Structure formats: C-alpha cells, structure tokens
C-alpha cells in the first residue's frame, strides 16, 4: 500500500476514485473516508491506539517543536513524538462527515480543492509560518478575488473558527480573528464543542462526536485538536507543502496529514514490518530505535554522556537538548515576545502561561489551571501533602523548598549539612502526615518547644551548646572550639536564669520560655548593639582576645569548667523545678547562700567564662574585651540564663574575663582569684559597657516581662549595693578578698543582693546605680570600678561613667538616696546577709560586713569623684584599649587568675559588675544573686591582688564596666514587685539611657515573643539563635548608635512626661511592659533588616 500511495502521491491529481483514500487526497477528497464503516475501522484502529499508548505516541508532539530539525532526528524519537496528528485520531472522520453534508459532487470538490490549493498555499503558508496563530501575520496577502468568490460559492467556508463558529471568507480575516481571539479562547468546553459540531455537520453529528478530538479544526485537511499549539504546528505542514500541498490520509483510520513522512510513519503502526516486544512489560514497537530506548528505561543504561559535565541520557535527542545549556544556544523564540528557550516545549509553556494560551491541566481540588505539568504536579501535591519537604536535621516539614531552605539556614546555621542541596530533599510519603497534618504541625511545635524546655535542664546544655557553638562558630568564636563549648555552657546557664526570671515574673509556660529565651537572645543582641557601637567594638575586640585567652587558659579553666558545668546543670535543674524556688533560690542564693551559688555560679560562670576568660590574666583582660563581644552571644545565653546571676557575672566576665569573672571562677579553686577579684572589679568597671548592653539586653530580654520588676529590683539591689558600696562595699571587697575570706564575701554578696532586691532601686540607683536604676549595672559598675580601681580611682570613674552613659543627673541624685538608703539598706543587708551566711555556713556576717564596710569605705571615697560623661563615653569606647593595656599590666599576676576569671566571668560578670566597687558587689548580689555572690567573693580575693595592678586599668575599665553592669544587673535581679518599683524609678530615672536601654531590650524580648509566636515563632527563634553571632555585632554598630540616640531622646521625653515614650513613633505608655512590647515591634523589623543586609554583604 505504501508503494501505491507513493505512486499516487507522486502522480498528483484526480486519478483516485471516490473510495481512493490512499492516494494524495485534496482537502475535500479525503473525506470519502466516511465510506468505510466503523466496524471496518475498529480493529486496526485499536491496534494503532494500543501501540500509541505503549510507545507514548500520544504523549509526544515533539515534532511540533522540531519543525526546523531534520527528519532523521525525528527518526530517533519515539514513534509518536514527531507525529503532529498522532494524538488526533478522529480528525479525518469529522471532516468527512462535514463533506457528507455537502451536496457537491466529487468533481466539484476536486476542482475546488485544486483551486484552493493553488490560491491558498501562500497565505496559509504565511499564516502558519508565524509559529502560528500566536504570531500576528499582519502582512499576509489577501486572497485573490477569485479565491474569495470560490470560497463564497462553496457553502462551507474554508476558514472556520470552531470555538466561536466564526467563518472567515479570507485567510487574512481568519488570521486576524484568531489573533483577536487569543489562544486562551481556543480551549472550549464540551458543550461548545458539541454545538460547533452540530452546526458544522448536521447529518453526521454522531460520527463526529465519536471521533472528534477538540474544538480547533483545520479546514484544509480536516485536522482537529483541542490544543492550540498542535494546531499551529499543524499549519506549518501546509506552509512547508507550499503549492504542491497534498493531504495524506490513513485508509484504516481517520488520520490525515500533509507530511508524507508522518503519513508513512503512521502507517507502520497499522502494518508493522517487524514488531519489537519488550520482555519486561507490554511494550512493543515496529521501530528498533524506539524499542532500544524503551529497554534502557529498564536497564538504566545511559550511553549518551556530556563531555562537559556528569550529565548522561538514554536518548541522543536529550543530550542534544542538554548541550544547549552549555553553549547557551536558544534557537526557539516566542512569536509574541522576545522570550527565547533552548527547547520548544519551554516556549510552548511560556506562551500558555504568559500569553494566555490554553491551560489544559486543572487542579481537581481547586480552580488552579496551568499548562506546566511540573507546576501542576507540585500544586496538587500541596493539596495531598501540604508539608512534604522534610528537614534532614529535625522534624520540621515545609510546603515549599524555599521555606525549607530558610528554615535550614536559620535553625541549623552551623550544621555540617548547611550546604545541603535542598532540591535533593526527599518528600514525605507518610499518609499519616496528610491526615494529621494540623495536629502534627502543632505537635511538632510543642515538641520543639518542649525539647527546648527540656534542654534547659539537661538536654538544653547540649542543645544550647550546639546553638552557642553555632553562633560562636559563625562569628568570632569560630577560632576556638573550647570557647564555643564554654559559651554553650554559659548560654545554657543564661537560659536557665532567664527561665527563672520568666517563671518568677511572667509565670509563662515552658514553651513560651523557650521562645522567649530565643527572642530575648535576639533582643539582647539588638539592644546590646543599640547600647553602643563602642560596646560592640569592645566586645568584638574582646571576643578576639577572648578566643586567644580561652585557648591559653583552657587548661586552667577546663577542670573548673567541668565542675562548674555540673553545678550549672544542678542549678538549671533546680531552677526548672519551681519558679518560686528559682526566685527564692536566686534571691537567697544570691543574698544568703552565695558560697553554694558561687560554686555553681562561679563554676557555671567559670564554665561559661573559662573558655572566654580562662586564658591568662593578660588574655583574661583580652578575653574581657573578647567576651564583651562574645558575651552578647554568651550574654544572650548566659545573660538570659544568668541575668539573675550570670547577667551581672557575664558582663563582669566579659570585662572581668580579663580580671573579675576569671577571678571569681579562679577564686573558688585558687587564691590568685583575689587578683582576679580586683580584676573582676576592674572588669566590671571596664566590661560594664558591653555588659551594660549585654545585661541591659539580658535585663530587657530576660526581664522583658520582668523588666519593670527587674528594674525595681535592680534599683533595690543597686541601693543596697550602693549602701554596701559605701560601707558594705568594703565588706564585699573583703569577701572577694575572701576568696581569701570566702565566707565574708559570700555574706556580703548575698546580703547586698537581698538588700538590693528588697530595698527600692532608688536607693541603689541614687548614687551611681541610680543612674543605673533602670540598669543597676551602672551603679554596680561604679562600685566595681571603685574596687577594681583600687578604691578611689576605680570607684570615681564608674559614677561619672554611669551618669554620662545613662544620665549624670541620676547619678547626682542617687548619692543622697544612697547615703540614706545605704544606711538602712546596710542594716537590712547585714541582717539578711547574716541570715544567709548562717544558712550557707559562711564566715560570720559581722566579719564579712566589716570587711565589706572597710572595702566599701575605701571604694566610696574613690568613686566620689565622677568622671565627666565624655570621659565615661571615651572610656566606654576605650574599654577595650584599657582592658588590653590593663591586661598587659594584669597579665603577669592575672594570667593564672585570668583563666579562672574567664571561667567566672561569664556567670560572675554580673556579680563582678555589682561587686566591682563592692557597691557593685552588693549591687551584683541584687542584680545576680547567685552569680554576683560568687563574683563578689572572687572579686574580694582578686581585688586584693588586682587592686594593685589594675588600679589604673580598673579606673578606666570601671567607667565602661559601670555602665554595662548598671544596665544589666538591674533587670536580671528585679522581682515583680521590684519591677513595679523599677517602673516608678525608671520614670524618675528615665533620664538614664542605660535604664531605657534595659527597658528597650526587655521590650525587644517581648516583641519577638509576640511577633514570632505561633507559626513564625520557630523560624524567628531559629533566626535569632542562628544569627546572634552571625553578624549582629559587626553589622549593627550603626543601628546601635542610632538606637542609643533614640533611646536617649526617649529617656528625655520620659523624664519630662513621666512615662515611656516610643523613640520611633513618639507614642507614650504608662507601663514598661506595654512600652517594651510596642518598641519591640519596631526593633524586630530593624533586627531582621540588619540581618538581611549583613547576609547580602
């Protein structure tokens, strides 16, 4: 038959009879196919359909996109890939039915078709030439009048738009109509299709319904389809045929084409010369190439390999297409725009999506429609399995890859799989998740939160250690693994103290605590950065130094760190046991039972600090600066957990890392701690700025809800601290010396803590701490400065520094309050301290108080001369320098003690800050009951040795340290009642920026919790955890400066109005909690914007 067909096709013309469907049929001749009955067509057609189904012939319309390629290339493709009409099996019958309805004889049909073929070829050619009706053929020559007349004479118009039943009298009109119609309207529903059929063929509607494939039909050859891209590709065949256009149709089925190649190819489906059958499935084909390619699907053979990359394919055409990705060749262009692609199917998809082409893929669950099969599958998958992208590290599941990538970067920033290719993540296939998705999501969140909460006790150490390591590693702590580990310990401890504060003040759930902790960390970072670029710079410098000193002092601090870690765990467990117990323990342990707390706090802080402060005294001093920056991360962890204890300790440790913290930790194990104690005081004086920021953050973050209470407590604490500073301060100095006199120090530290906590903040804030009132750290710093500076020198710098940083007027006013309140506080503190000491079994209260009083007397006289604000600020900015230079001096004696101080510094920073001048020691007790008490002891011991070497350094360091200590200790130690007091005090002392900073930080904490609660909480928490150390310190210096200015302005407004005023929108609030929540809404945005900017940089 093929030969016969070929002969006829080459012979041309009207030699065929009415039944001659094999020859080249003219447009109207081919419809003689209706002479064949359906019965005759059934069997062969079924064979072809089966073959098409198995070979994928229906699926492929590659030839639509391979028009410009050689036919031999098509030979390599599956049987149906190159057949434009393979998927349209009933096109011929439909047309033949139309012809049936026509009364014209065969001869008229032939003549008409011949004339049309002569007249139309060019226009059709052009019309299809533009890849098809997407392109606008504006310059198509109109049909000749003769053609139009003949078209009119024929009852059936040659150009018919089936979707809308429009019949064009000329090709130009038809092309214009299609252009106006737009591809989107060519996809018509079945009802419209039936109507169109009814109009086109009255008598043969039934037959047409059976074989019709869609609403779009070619009037030249009877080709019909429901896909516009197929139709436009089909028109190209007419254009290629040109004047010699011939229509080839199958004698067995309704297939018709103008391509002899495709017609012969189609006939092989009915009359295969040899059938290749697959032994593993039902596939068969008469073409060996197709069979071979199919078999490769079973064997996995991919012989076609790319020489430029690992790509390989089982088909040559796939490799050819792939090579275009390397060459950049994009030969396929959209006819309506400048879009180009390396594959025609991409252009087709583009046309459907962008140019409103048909979107045959409809979502069964919603109204979503698309022409992109991959998008369709993804979309449907979202209905079936909303969260199919699993995190390889945790149980998190995302609905989109981008969400999983965001989760992974934020939650697992230091994970070894950080560079994981998310595109390779396997989808979930558990139906369980589909049914229980909402519950699972909630459960996952609760589990994560519970895990975080559990981490606070035992798992949190590992968890936070990992997180802290991530933060530390991601930033400056990467250099030393030990540092990250210690920092992890510190963070664990901070989180524990934060949990206590949260429990005491907010009584929030454990889940909220975990989220709050994370958010607090974020806020601490933000507020820390806001507190001052100076502090950040110092912290950055200190971090670097810290890492070095940590590596050096690791040997010294490691044993202490271990014991401290155990103690920290115990403390964490105890803290979790009960909020009340935590509050009581914090107060009592800080006030009365400081020996035990000193050990756990010092040890815990030592663990947290040792890595940072552990190095030598010189390195300790360096660590101080280093820690100033690490403390932000560690402060986030430690200050949050240790805000009550470590918060002050941490600041102290950050700067004390150089002296104080290390000494605290060292003191318990070694007497050189005394030197460290002096250094701790100096560190307090020096570190307070970083600590201030850190503690302020801690106070704000940990005390966020507790902020008012903490502020009050801080103030109360600061008051006793000042009292202690003037009188008990000396006692505290002796207790720190008590590392030599361990008991007195404990007594003093704990009593000052009690006095400070119980007594109003105003008392403490009044002298130096009042400036700190909102942030007792300043007062504490000033006392610590006095102590560290050896008495007058140290203490003098702190008071001026506190007032300048926070507010000089406050510092001026507080002294009067201090004098009065200190006396009352001294008495109450003594009674409390005695009780605590008796309970703890420390040295008699009297001895410790005598020591503290003597020390505080010495300290009080030196701090009396306050430094100007400028000096304080310069010192704050120069703290690093002072610490470094001071460290140089301290290095010789302090190196040993410095390692211990580093250990103590993190948990004991707050205590050191409070104890630094012994005002700070008592203030530390107030601010960080446990940590401060421990720090106080070490400070007294270390102060004896360090007072000599660090007098100058302490004077300088204390200036910076006071500010930071004043800010942080206040909030950490303040109880709810103290919060109220603090609010009142803060209103009076709003002028002090540190207090405002603390409030802002605490507000930031609340804001993160509120903003990121619910679904976003995990991500936001993770972001804060992952990004605390990622670049906040480096990238936030500027925002910190601006935030400081804003905070100062806000404080001034607050002082005037007596309430909290938003620095961003000037809204005023009566309560600190409301203000903090509101302010955090502004700062959270800044936080993430800054982080994003950092990521881009």
UniProtKB/Swiss-Prot annotation:
Keywords: Cytoplasm, Deafness, Disease variant, Metal-binding, Non-syndromic deafness, Nucleus, Phosphoprotein, Repeat, Repressor, Transcription, Transcription regulation, Ubl conjugation, Zinc, Zinc-finger. Changing residue 1009 to A: Loss of interaction with BTRC. Residues 480-490, 913-930 have a biased composition (Polar residues). The keyword Zinc-finger applies. Coiled coil: none annotated. Residues 83-103, 127-159, 452-642, 774-837, 853-938, 961-1049 are annotated as: Disordered. PROSITE patterns: ZINC_FINGER_C2H2_1, ZINC_FINGER_C2H2_2. The C2H2-type zinc finger 5 is required for nuclear localization. It is linked to Wilms tumor 6: A pediatric malignancy of kidney, and the most common childhood abdominal malignancy. It is caused by the uncontrolled multiplication of renal stem, stromal, and epithelial cells. This is RE1-silencing transcription factor.
């Amino acid at each position: 038959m093929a030969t016969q067909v070929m002969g006829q096709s080459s012979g041309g013309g009207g030699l065929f009879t009415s039944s001659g469907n094999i020859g080249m049929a003219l447009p109207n001749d081919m419809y003689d196919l209706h002479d064949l009955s359906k019965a005759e067509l059934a069997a062969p057609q079924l064979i072809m359909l089966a073959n098409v189904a198995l070979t994928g012939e229906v699926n492929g319309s590659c030839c639509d996109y391979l028009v410009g390629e050689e036919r031999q290339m098509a030979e390599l493709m599956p049987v149906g890939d190159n057949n434009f009409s393979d998927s349209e099996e009933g096109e011929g019958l439909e047309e033949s039915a139309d012809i049936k309805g026509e009364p014209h004889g065969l001869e008229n049909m032939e003549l008409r078709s011949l004339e049309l073929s002569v007249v139309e070829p060019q226009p059709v050619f052009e019309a299809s030439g533009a890849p098809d009706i997407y392109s606008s053929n504006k310059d198509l020559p109109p049909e000749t009048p003769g053609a139009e007349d003949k078209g009119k004479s024929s009852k059936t118009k040659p150009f018919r738009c089936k979707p809308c039943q429009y019949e064009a009298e000329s090709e130009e009109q038809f092309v214009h109509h299609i252009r106006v119609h737009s591809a989107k309207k060519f996809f018509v529903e079945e009802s419209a299709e039936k109507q169109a059929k009814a109009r086109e063929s009255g008598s043969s509607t039934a037959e047409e319904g059976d074989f019709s494939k869609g609403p779009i039909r070619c009037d030249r050859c009877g080709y019909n389809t429901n896909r516009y891209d197929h139709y436009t590709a089909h028109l190209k065949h007419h254009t290629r045929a040109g004047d010699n256009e011939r229509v080839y149709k199958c004698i067995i089925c309704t297939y018709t084409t103008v391509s002899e190649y495709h017609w012969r190819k189609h006939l092989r489906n009915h009359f295969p010369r040899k059938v290749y059958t697959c032994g593993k499935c039902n596939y068969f084909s008469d073409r060996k190439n197709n069979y071979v390619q199919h078999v490769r699907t079973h064997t996995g053979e991919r012989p076609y390999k790319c020489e430029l990359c690992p790509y390989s394919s089982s088909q040559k055409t796939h490799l050819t297409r792939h090579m275009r990705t390397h060459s950049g060749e994009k030969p396929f262009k959209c006819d309506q725009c400048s879009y180009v692609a390396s594959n025609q199917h991409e252009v087709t998809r583009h046309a459907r999506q962008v140019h409103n082409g048909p979107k045959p893929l409809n979502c069964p669950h919603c109204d979503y429609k698309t022409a992109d099969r991959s998008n369709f599958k993804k979309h449907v998958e979202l209905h079936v399995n909303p969260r199919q992208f699993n995190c390889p590290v945790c149980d998190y599941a995302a609905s989109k890859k981008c969400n999983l990538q965001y989760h992974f970067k934020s939650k697992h920033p230091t994970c070894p799989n950080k560079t994981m290719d998310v595109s390779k993540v396997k989808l979930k296939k558990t139906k369980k998740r589909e049914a229980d998705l909402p519950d699972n999501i909630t459960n996952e969140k609760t589990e994560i939160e519970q895990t975080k909460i559990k981490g606070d006790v035992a798992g949190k150490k590992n968890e936070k250690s990992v997180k802290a390591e991530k933060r530390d590693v991601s930033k400056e702590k990467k250099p030393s693994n030990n540092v990250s580990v210690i920092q992890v310990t510190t963070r664990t401890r901070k989180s524990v103290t934060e949990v206590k504060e949260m429990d005491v003040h907010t009584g929030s759930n454990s889940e909220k605590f975990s989220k709050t902790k994370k958010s607090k960390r974020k806020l601490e970072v933000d507020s820390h950065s806001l507190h001052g670029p100076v502090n950040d710079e110092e912290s950055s410098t200190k971090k670097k130094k810290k890492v070095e000193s940590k590596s050096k002092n690791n040997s010294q601090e490691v044993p202490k760190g271990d014991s401290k870690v155990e103690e920290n765990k115990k403390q964490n467990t105890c803290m979790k046991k009960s909020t009340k117990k935590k509050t009581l323990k914090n107060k009592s342990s800080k006030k009365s039972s400081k020996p035990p707390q000193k050990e756990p706090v010092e040890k815990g802080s030592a663990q947290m600090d040792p890595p940072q402060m552990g190095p030598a005294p010189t390195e300790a001093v360096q660590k101080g600066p280093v820690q100033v920056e690490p403390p932000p991360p560690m402060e986030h962890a430690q200050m949050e957990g240790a805000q009550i204890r470590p918060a002050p300790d941490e600041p102290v440790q950050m700067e004390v890392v150089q002296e104080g913290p290390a000494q605290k930790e060292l003191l318990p194990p070694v007497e050189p701690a005394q030197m460290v104690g002096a250094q701790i005081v100096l560190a307090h004086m020096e570190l307070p700025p970083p600590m201030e920021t850190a503690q302020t953050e801690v106070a704000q973050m940990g005390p966020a809800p507790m902020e008012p209470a903490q502020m009050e407590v801080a103030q109360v604490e600061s008051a006793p601290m000042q009292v202690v500073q003037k009188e008990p301060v000396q006692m505290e100095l002796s207790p720190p010396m008590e590392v030599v006199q361990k008991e007195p120090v404990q007594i003093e530290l704990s009593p000052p803590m009690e006095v400070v906590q119980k007594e109003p903040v105003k008392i403490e804030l009044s002298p130096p701490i009042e400036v700190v009132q909102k942030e007792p750290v300043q007062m504490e710093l000033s006392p610590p400065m006095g102590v560290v500076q050896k008495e007058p020198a140290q203490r003098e710098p702190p008071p001026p520094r506190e007032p300048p940083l926070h507010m000089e007027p406050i510092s001026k006013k507080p002294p009067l309050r201090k004098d009065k309140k200190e006396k009352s506080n001294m008495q109450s503190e003594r009674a409390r301290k005695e009780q605590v000491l008796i309970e703890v079994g420390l040295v008699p209260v009297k001895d410790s108080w005598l020591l503290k009083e003597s020390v505080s007397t010495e300290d009080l006289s030196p701090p009396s001369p306050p430094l100007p604000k400028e000096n304080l600020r310069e010192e704050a900015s120069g703290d690093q320098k002072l610490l470094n230079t001071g460290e140089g001096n301290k290095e010789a004696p302090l190196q040993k003690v410095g390692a211990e101080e580093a250990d103590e510094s993190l948990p004991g920073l707050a205590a050191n800050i409070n104890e630094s001048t012994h005002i700070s020691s008592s203030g530390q007790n107030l601010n960080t009951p446990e940590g401060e008490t421990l720090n106080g002891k070490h400070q007294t011991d270390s102060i004896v040795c360090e007072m000599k070497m660090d007098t100058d350094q302490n004077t300088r360091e204390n200036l910076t340290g006071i500010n930071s200590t004043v800010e942080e200790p206040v909030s950490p130690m303040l109880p709810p009642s103290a919060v109220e007091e603090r609010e009142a005090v803060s209103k009076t002392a709003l002028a002090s920026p540190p207090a405002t900073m603390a409030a802002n930080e605490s507000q930031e904490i609340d804001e993160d919790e509120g903003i990121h609660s619910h679904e976003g909480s995990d991500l936001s928490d993770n972001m804060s955890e992952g990004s605390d150390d990622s670049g906040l310190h480096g990238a936030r210096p500027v925002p910190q400066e601006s935030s400081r200015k804003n905070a100062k302005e806000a404080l001034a407004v607050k002082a005037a109005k007596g309430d909290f005023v938003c620095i961003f929108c000037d809204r005023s609030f009566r309560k600190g909690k409301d203000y903090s929540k509101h302010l955090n809404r502004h700062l959270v945005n800044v936080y993430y914007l800054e982080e994003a900017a950092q990521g881009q940089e």
